[in-house]
UniProtKB/Swiss-Prot annotation:
Protein name as annotated: Small ribosomal subunit protein bS20
SUPFAM superfamilies assigned: Ribosomal protein S20 (SSF46992)
Similarity comment text for this entry: Belongs to the bacterial ribosomal protein bS20 family.
PANTHER family per the UniProt record, alphabetical: 30S RIBOSOMAL PROTEIN S20 (PTHR33398), SMALL RIBOSOMAL SUBUNIT PROTEIN BS20C (PTHR33398:SF1)
Example GO BP: translation
Native source species: Thiobacillus denitrificans (strain ATCC 25259 / T1)
RNA-binding as UniProt keyword: yes
């Protein structure tokens, strides 16, 4: 348990930041799932539209350093390949 006022404040801040970061990660996972679902449905136009919006989410979260930029690039690359590979 934090004893000093400074340590208590840092604990509060860490908790708030953790909650915010978890919600951002959840948003990331949801965006990726939406693209995968559109690909499975076979609708290329919808998949491309959802992919564009998910790229924005991925970049935003990487810019905030919630995920590493290389992980963001990997997600974008794999989703792009999946969308382009649709028949």
């Amino acid at each position: 348990m934090a004893n000093s006022a400074q340590a208590r404040k840092r604990a509060r801040q860490a908790s708030a930041q953790r909650d915010h970061n978890m919600s951002q990660r959840s948003e990331l996972r949801t965006a990726i799932k939406k693209v995968r679902k559109a690909i499975e449905a076979g609708d290329k136009a919808a998949a491309q539209a959802v992919y564009q919006s998910s790229v924005s989410v991925i970049d935003s979260i990487a810019d905030k350093q919630i995920i590493h930029k290389n992980k963001a690039a990997r997600h974008k690359s794999r989703l792009s390949l999946a969308v382009k590979g649709m028949a």
